[in-house]
């Protein structure tokens, strides 16, 4: 008996067309383009997950720098001062403090200033 593959090929094509639903132009309708875009989208999403980590770290550092400069200290001086004082706090938490609890952040800035002054002497 001869085997026909119309059911399997239709299922396969339907899978990619369904995944590409919402894509603009012919990419959402034509099988070959939809399949290419499906794989490309996977690459983009993988790279995006990696870039998101970088972007958030940059955002935290920018926020910390802005809040530290308002207190008369640069970002690198603040981080160095906290390291000298053996304060173990990450940039995400420092950023949250800078945005939501300025008084708490100012305490960390004062700790950094004191440890920097002690290291100079």
From Swiss-Prot:
In the record, what terms sit under GO molecular function?
rRNA binding; structural constituent of ribosome
**Top-level division of the source organism's lineage:** Bacteria
Q: Tell me which UniProt keywords the record has, alphabetically.
A: Ribonucleoprotein, Ribosomal protein, RNA-binding, rRNA-binding
Biological-process GO terms, alphabetical: ribosomal large subunit assembly; translation
Q: State the disulfide connectivity.
A: none
GO cellular component assignments:
ribonucleoprotein complex; ribosome
Which InterPro entries did the record assign?
Ribosomal_bL20, RIBOSOMAL_L20_CS, Ribosomal_protein_bL20_C
What family does the entry list? Belongs to the bacterial ribosomal protein bL20 family.
The UniProt entry, under NCBIfam families, shows: rplT_bact
Role, per record: Binds directly to 23S ribosomal RNA and is necessary for the in vitro assembly process of the 50S ribosomal subunit. It is not involved in the protein synthesizing functions of that subunit.
Q: What is this protein called?
A: Large ribosomal subunit protein bL20
- Naturally occurring in which organism (per UniProt): Petrotoga mobilis (strain DSM 10674 / SJ95)
Q: Which gene encodes it?
A: rplT
């Amino acid at each position: 008996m001869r085997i026909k593959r119309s059911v399997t090929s239709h299922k396969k094509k339907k899978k990619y067309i369904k995944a590409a639903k919402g894509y603009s132009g012919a990419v959402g309708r034509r099988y070959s383009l939809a399949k290419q875009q499906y794989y490309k989208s996977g690459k983009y999403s993988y790279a995006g997950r990696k870039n998101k980590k970088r972007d958030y770290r940059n955002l935290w550092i920018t926020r910390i720098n802005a809040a530290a400069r308002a207190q008369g200290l640069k970002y690198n001086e603040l981080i160095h001062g906290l390291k000298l004082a053996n304060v173990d706090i990450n940039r995400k938490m420092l950023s949250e403090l800078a945005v939501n609890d300025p008084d708490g952040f100012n305490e960390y800035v004062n700790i950094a200033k004191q440890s920097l002054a002690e290291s100079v002497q």
